[in-house]
Amino acid sequence: MTTDINELDLNKTYSYADYLTWQFQEKLELIKGKIFKMSPAPSTNHQRISMELAGILYNFFKPHQCNLFSAPFDVRLIDKRKSTLDQDIFTVVQPDLCVICDETKIDERGAI
């Protein structure tokens, strides 16, 4: 388990399996295996807009049996040529809002 982001080589390529072992304060995303630090807490205006959009999206998608999630919520993006195993996933993002309409894509760790 890694507890300090400074212990990581930012030039290395990491997988979701690596990501799961990290326990530090900084929030980050993996894009094609590269670490990207997320900005600190969003502004008040950002939060207002996000919540307004969440309300609109929730009302729109509710009859369609879709799920709306807000950050932090891990979304693992897969390469269709590879497996969905943690070591084969190299992109993990935390969008402000995320709509998932396929229940099979949701698990206890987020969505894939």
Q: Where on the chain are the PLM-derived regions?
A:
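Gly/Pro/Ser/Thr-rich low-complexity, intrinsically disordered segments predominantly at protein N-termini
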Residues: 1-112
